[in-house]
């Protein structure tokens, strides 16, 4: 029951407050599309609409605690779906000897990267990919055609319709819906490669069916009202990933989650996570390349290679790699017990009639020696297993202890008040201001959700902003004079800045606080709110 144990571990380590600040603008958009008072690109495609409706519905029932429980269950389902096809690939003896070690490895990885298990649209994408992981290889299998007719079997036809419906829903959950057709291409590449190795010529109708499935998946965006704009959306994501256009280059270089783990490691950010991430991705790349070199490249190895490359390009893609990595690790594990048994058997003096022991001692002594060696062999062969199991249990207990301790430190509201301005936003709702509001991108979504009447400057939807706008926004942190000039020209009457967990704005805050045109109206240990008096602007007029 390896997949079930890993799923439970994923559920447990996914229980923590809503640390991803983007969830708040998703919740705000679920209520009403959020418009910033600053200019945005057009056309606007709300590719997250269905995801926003779901999280908004869950939040409306039970608030942040229920949303945390909901996403924890979904993460468990994701890993269960990816590991489900392998539940019968191992013998019972192999499972007993390797399951505990495998679960320990998974638990250790989950603990290190637990804060990646957030409630984001990528979670829905992984859920749909997990379903595809189980269904698409069966749908595209030639044996699923009826032997008497050229039609699909009813079960296969039902699975195909289910996949197409999921793809249609996926198009309005996240721009990564393109992973569905790409995974279908990977399945076809693996199947056609196997057929080529075995010198099997696939029937023409089967090849046409394969191509038709991929084209049908690609056509799903056109069944929505946004049509072409929705179809082109993934190209914008690719642009942001590699930084081909100026605005995407700014995003790729300035947003931490979109930077490579190598870049983050050299900057000294999340050093432990980055080192482990790079090591795991490198292991995945080496394993995939080695199997390809040996001529045994399959679907897992294709996906492992692709997701490892994506994770090394941008840290946020690591969650795409992790389920595939666990599948690959599960299918290629090595057992120390097998080597121990081989050594013991080679040393055992009870095999063969011409063995040296039979020449040196009699038959009765041989029987006694046989039982003695058998007993010693069982002890020797079981010793590594006992040590391994004991070590695994100790490590799992240690991780669970740290996890339980972390639960005590969380606020019962399950809102990460260190990352969003909980106290400041509550104060601002009852203390209105004149002019526009300036906020940083991480606080924008929460402010829009808590106080929708006060239009925000920016939120996490960077794809809606131009390169010039984003570059000028980032310059404010290092050029206080530029910010104060724009505050006058743009009629900014209030500004809110983080004080601790996002240190970009420290220099600007230190200049604004003593300035005569700015007044501190709210301050706590995490956020500061300042009002702008416009005195200089009035005197000039």
Per-region residue spans from a language model:
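Membrane-interface alpha helices of multi-pass inner-membrane proteins
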Residues: 10, 109-113, 158-175, 184, ...
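Juxtamembrane membrane-water interface segments that cap and precede transmembrane helices
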Residues: 39-40, 45-57, 228, 232-273
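Transmembrane-helix motifs of polytopic, lipid-linked glycan transferases
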Residues: 69-92
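Specific aromatic-rich, kink-prone transmembrane helix
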Residues: 81, 112, 124-144, 185-188, ...
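Short hydrophobic alpha-helices at membrane interfaces in multi-pass membrane enzymes
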Residues: 138-168, 207-212, 298-304
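Membrane-proximal, lumen/periplasm-facing interface regions of secretory-pathway glyco-
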Residues: 389-430, 442-444, 462, 474, ...
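Short periplasmic/luminal acceptor-recognition loop of GT-C membrane glycosyltransferases, typified by
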Residues: 429-467, 488, 493-500, 530
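Periplasmic/luminal catalytic loop of GT-C fold multi-pass membrane glycosyltransferases
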Residues: 470-527
